[in-house]
Amino acid sequence: MERDLISVESRDLNEAELGYRTEPFVKMQPAFKDYLWGGTKLKEHYGKHCDYDSIAESWELSAHEAGQSIVASGRYKGRLFADNLSKIGRENCGWKCQSIERFPILVKLIDAKENLSVQVHPDDDYALSRENEYGKNEMWYVLEHEEGAGIKCGF
């Protein structure tokens, strides 16, 4: 459905209503994580630049308190992604975002040079009560892998 798309143009808004000019697409500066298992492929193959020697994760689109993306182009360049959402309003982020306080999706690139630890992710109720964050439902799209690599889930 078209209304599921994230766009600042999801309804007929104009500058007079909003008090500012909308831009349909903006570039984001990711937040980087340098966990022990990270590698150098995000730098070497994907052009990610940061001060870390290795990058485990590049949080491409994040309103998470532990690492927010920064708007890297357009009128709101330099603003935190979450602050930008506050300015354009949740109503412009799709109808499913109306009942939440924060943007619920975290898009990241991962370079797992070493094995990761076992990951156990709580549901929303548990995570909100313990860490004031949403739970982690995940979807993975593997861009490339080494011979013999694998993912185990659901055990």
Set out the residue ranges of the language-model regions.
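Transition-metal
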Residues: 1-154
